[in-house]
Amino acid sequence: MRHSLAEERREGARLDAGEAPVHGGFAEVKYIILQGDGMADYPLEALGGKTPLEAARTPNMDWLAARGVFGIAHVIPKGFPPGSDVGNMSIMGYDPAVYHTGRSPLEAASMGVALGPKDIAFRCNLVTLGGGSGGETYMEDFTAGHISTEEAAEIIRDIADKLGGDGIEFFPGVSYRHLMVWRNGKEKMITTPPHDITDQKVAGYMPTGDGADKLMQLMEASRPILGDHPVNKKRQAEGHRPATTIWLWGQGRAPALPSLTKRFGIKGGVISAVDIIHGLGVYAGLARIDVPGITGFLDTNYKGKGEYGVKSLEKNDLVFIHVEATDEAGHMGDVEKKIQAIEDFDGKVVGTVLTGMAHRKDWRVLLMPDHPTAITLKTHVADPVPFVLYSAEEPRHNGAMGYNEKDAVKTGVVAKQAFKLMEALIEGRQTWTET
């Protein structure tokens, strides 16, 4: 497969040789963003004080760290929640303080759901709530046992039939991740991401503020529908967790982002199993690249992501390759699974890309996560993350480096505003200074 891809790339290069240069003379340069979602973390006692990135075997990311601009980046601006919407907006080169309006409008764009200027999009999770010994209710599982997309679609269709109307619309997504739109709705209420409150009592995290009563009404009304749903009965019979309620959060209006083509004169694509990443791609002007077998979980087609990413560069200038499994393992609080996901990302995605691009001299990489997902907390945190800017045209010689938090800090290189890294990638900077 690698040989045939290389042959195809060489053929594509010959065909494109006569094309006019674009984006300020960088015509033949290819740009690759490699994003291992949430793979940064804190030192863990179970790993002898190492982080999962330190404990994992990552020869390909280490190779990049030894040859690129390597340091730590502040991806999440002060005052923003450490969500994937904020983090990936930064990585794609947009200042969240200017452009961020909420998470769910991005997911709506990915799903092809149009939003009017007064429409509010909400993430609609299918979750499992559990009962404590004292009668309280807690967030048992924000993924409803990683419910399948097919099962979830059946549930969301029934929710839409029974709870939709009067400006409320439901749209099925992937696994536990779905969408609700409130036409001419309200957005100023406070909502809580369910992945932030795993194993906690939900009473203190219900929606509050103007419009919260509508959300509460919908969430409560979903419980009897799901309690008697045939999909849940089948899941329980098979030993799986049921989806016991919908959980609404992450609201916002449609943002206005200038495309990367307009900003830099480049065209590109996005590879991800997650709607929010594709939604950002829609607003950034990046095409969706479909890869068979990608799931957003530990069983995803890692190698396919790398292969399709390399192949896409025959026609495109840039590819953004996102892997969700590292984040999911962090939310599970599973050290071994997170290390495995990191190693799979390194070997099957990063390694495949490095091999596929090895015959070229004119390509650049930005490697980083969007935020840490802390094993001990089972949620996102806003701490800075390790990043690498690598240029095959002008590789650096940093000595032996491991792609991890500790070695990144040792370099003394700090990107205080991570959204500026995209510009540095396009320009091919070999040093990092921030004005």
Pin down the residues of each PLM region.
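Feature captures the catalytic ectodomains and active-site-proximal regions of enzymes
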Residues: 10, 16-435
